[in-house]
Amino acid sequence: ATHLAPLGVRVNAIAPGFFITDQNRFLMMEKDGETPTPRGRKVLAKTPMHRFGEPGDLCGALQFLVSPSASFVTGTIIPVDGGFLAYSGV
């Protein structure tokens, strides 16, 4: 971000929390698709919003970062994690 800012390039990131995907579904959810596994329950217990993320949850942060409202924002990471960062993690 510091090297590209003089060129007018903003460098930011979104740090998603726990989202259920094909890659991690077996770790977070039982085969019924509704019941969290022991690990999934541990993650949810450390997530103040007590749910996994949905793809649409990322849209607000993304829309902000690409909007004129973020024209003076660079070098930042926006967590979209249901408050997970507020805890020490798993």
Task: Write out the residue ranges for each language-model feature.
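A short hydrophobic alpha-helix cap/turn motif
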Residues: 2-6, 19, 53, 66
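Short C-terminal tail/terminal secondary-structure segment
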Residues: 63, 74-90
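Small-residue (primarily alanine) positions within well-ordered alpha-helices
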Residues: 1, 13, 53, 59-61, ...
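A glycine/serine/threonine-rich, flexible loop-to-helix segment
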Residues: 6, 18-46, 87-90
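Short, small/polar-rich loop/turn modules that mediate ligand/substrate recognition or access, typified
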Residues: 5, 10, 73-75
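Conserved SDR Rossmann-fold cofactor-binding beta-strand/turn motif
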Residues: 10-20, 66, 79-81
